[in-house]
């Protein structure tokens, strides 16, 4: 599984469940290479860290001269979620962040991602920092983190050994 696979699965499920909650708001992957200017109302998420868990697993399934070598590593990625709201149907940025946090912790979200090979761990508490925006006004920037787990795989070309001839010599 790749970073893009995980981010697409998370974004798709967030959009689906926000729509079910009656909240039609864009969900953006943060820090994209092309910026299009300021948006007023959106939810942004981005990876904040990634850690391998345990040891890398190796398995083999020989097929002819190919060893069928496969390596797998369980990873845990931390996503940070933020909401930027100027004016959105009476919701504040904290309201939207709280709804998204509830969605991340919900059974439908967890189960939908589990079916795609992504595990979801409990979201953290909401942080409430403020910053000075591009107009010189204070703006609330609530955020929280949650972790997902998934497996990355690697299939290196490894030749299979077909015969081993011991050659033992006396010393």
How should these model regions be labeled?
Residues 145-171:
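Acidic, proline/glycine-rich low-complexity IDRs
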Residues 64-71, 133:
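Short beta-strand/turn micro-motifs at beta-sheet edges
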Residues 2, 88, 92, 134:
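Conserved aromatic-histidine-acidic binding/catalytic patches
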Residues 71-91, 98-100, 139-150:
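Oligomerization/assembly interface segments of phage tail-like spikes and tubes
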């Amino acid at each position: 599984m790749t970073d893009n696979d995980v981010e697409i699965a998370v974004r798709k499920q967030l959009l689906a469940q926000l729509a079910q909650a009656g909240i039609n708001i864009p969900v953006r992957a943060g820090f994209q290479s092309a910026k299009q200017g300021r948006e007023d109302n959106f939810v942004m998420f981005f990876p904040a860290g990634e850690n391998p868990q345990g040891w890398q697993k190796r398995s083999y399934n020989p097929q002819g001269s190919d060893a069928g070598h496969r390596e797998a590593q369980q990873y845990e990625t931390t996503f940070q979620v933020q909401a930027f709201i100027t004016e959105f149907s009476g919701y504040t940025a904290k309201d939207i962040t709280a709804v998204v946090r509830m969605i991340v912790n919900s059974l439908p979200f967890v189960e939908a991602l589990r079916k795609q090979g992504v595990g979801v761990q409990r979201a953290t508490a909401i942080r409430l920092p403020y910053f000075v925006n591009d107009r010189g006004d204070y703006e609330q920037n609530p955020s929280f983190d949650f972790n997902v787990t998934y497996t990355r795989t690697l299939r290196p070309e490894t030749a299979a050994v077909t015969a081993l001839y011991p050659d033992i010599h006396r010393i």
